[in-house]
Amino acid sequence: MIKIYAPASIGNVGVGFDVLGAAISPIDNSLLGDVITITSSKQFSLTSTGTFSNQLPKDINKNIVKKCWTYFCKILKKNLPVSITLEKNMPIGSGLGSSACSIVATVVAINTFFNKPINNFELLKLMGKLEGKISGSVHYDNVAPSYLGGMQLIINKNDIVCQKISIFKNWLWVIAWPGISISTEQARTLLPLQYSKKVCIQHSQNLAGFIHATYTHQSKLASMFMHDIIAEPYRIKLLPYFLKTKQIIIDMGAIACGISGSGPAIFAVSDNLLTAKKIATWLTNYYLTNDRGFVHICKIDTIGARKIGL
């Protein structure tokens, strides 16, 4: 039996649309991500459990886990008789890399179960391809950090998909999912096809400045560059209270705040626990819209996908 956990992630991290992603884990050591269990079987079977399993397609052939298995069968050119259980702990359309969690956990679990016939590079490319089936375009800003851990800069040149960049270990990431869902594909259609030269220059400056600040260990400087001028101005149509929420959180002492991926989850960054707890309490009281929503104080998960349990 193989049991693999893949952590949630923040796509874009505000400043790096489609090229930055960070894996996260709650500081209380709880698991925020999906779990895949694989055992030997005479034929393929898939069982879904977990808090958000009711959001999954009723047709098993539309389940991303089944699609992962199908791709593996094609790559290895043989049928793989296994029993797979998906523990769906991440809400679909949350902005926290829900589909990436399932994809990464499944691909790693199948590859591990069959003694790793596919190398890490090919695995990551497969993950990106599978993610594209759901979001409408191939991108790695969720699958890469969920798989490899840390904060990943997506390069996708030659045989290099991504590179792990330096992080600030004292940064706390307060994550809030309000309890509603937004389609990634829908959120992407809101974005313009072209941007002005001014916006492109400012975005380049922000991203370059942020990367530089992480490597030179300038925490304050890094936070100053964490502005999303590519997606946020357009996606706030789906989050009518975001700008007001963001201002309140900044006034409470957050050093940065943004939309996680396509939303509706948001993140706030703090460099001290007291402020993080205050922000978490406020978000719990005022940002969550139903009892399905949640708030977690997290740190960057530096491990990524991993075996758990036995």
UniProtKB/Swiss-Prot annotation:
Reactions this protein catalyses: L-homoserine + ATP = O-phospho-L-homoserine + ADP + H(+)
PROSITE patterns on file: GHMP_KINASES_ATP
Presence of keyword ATP-binding: yes
Residues engaged in binding ATP: P91, I92, G93, S94, G95, L96, G97, S98, S99, A100, C101
GO terms for MF: ATP binding; homoserine kinase activity
Gene Ontology biological process: threonine biosynthetic process
Keyword Manganese: no
Subcellular locations according to the entry: Cytoplasm
Enzyme Commission (EC) number: 2.7.1.39
Xref: SUPFAM superfamilies: GHMP Kinase, C-terminal domain (SSF55060), Ribosomal protein S5 domain 2-like (SSF54211)
InterPro entries assigned: GHMP_kinase_C_dom, GHMP_kinase_C_sf, GHMP_kinase_N_dom, GHMP_knse_ATP-bd_CS, Homoserine_kinase, Ribosomal_Su5_D2-typ_SF, Ribsml_uS5_D2-typ_fold_subgr
GO (cellular component) term, any one: cytoplasm
Record keywords: Amino-acid biosynthesis, ATP-binding, Cytoplasm, Kinase, Nucleotide-binding, Threonine biosynthesis, Transferase
Recorded metabolic or biological pathway in which this protein acts: Amino-acid biosynthesis; L-threonine biosynthesis; L-threonine from L-aspartate: step 4/5
Function: Catalyzes the ATP-dependent phosphorylation of L-homoserine to L-homoserine phosphate.
Family: Belongs to the GHMP kinase family. Homoserine kinase subfamily.
NCBIfam families membership: PRK01212.1-4, thrB
HAMAP family tied to this protein: Homoser_kinase
Name of this protein: Homoserine kinase
Organism annotation: Buchnera aphidicola subsp. Baizongia pistaciae (strain Bp)
Designated gene of the protein: thrB
